[in-house]
Amino acid sequence: GEVTFHLTIDPAEAKILAEEFQSNFCLFICNPQADTIIESLPNVFKIKGVENLTDISIALTSAFRILDESPKGPRRACIEIISDILLQHHAVQTRRWLTQLITELRSRAFTTLAVMNPKMHPLEEVHAIIDLFGGEINIYERAREEKFLKIKKMHNRKYLESELPLKKERLEK
């Protein structure tokens, strides 16, 4: 029963979570086709895209108002729209918007996970965004399509510095 906010372009499996956990899972879909992707539910916020960051902020503010009435406890936010926002608004505007959002989420006891494809952006823009967060976890591929997970930084936390192999059969069990 932990409160979770999920911001995405394509909800995929998150649609099921939004339908099953309406009291503690808020889904924010930033997609012009949002109305055809999922039915209207009280915990689903449909935004026309990432072009207007104010629209996203307004939807989040609406969800925060609902959240203020729920019991306190662990909260999580997953922001999967970073790459799309960075492509549309570049580093300065994205960083300004994210700084405000992260501050708001922290003040409401959220742990935030941001998902970004660093290969889509210039290195300076990637670092401008990564520096806003207290940690960095990379998932990458090497030869033979093997995937690895490596924690690059984790503020005020102990962590394993070596990379970990990710095996699909382990994830599916």
Question: What do these predicted regions represent?
Answer:
Residues 20-21, 68-71, 104-108, 130-131:
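Conserved catalytic network of the ASCE P-loop NTPase/AAA+ motor domain
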Residues 90-111, 117-119, 125:
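Conserved binding-pocket/active-site segment within a compact domain
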Residues 10-14, 32-36, 83-84, 118-122, ...:
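Conserved nucleotide-binding/hydrolysis micro-motifs of P-loop NTPases
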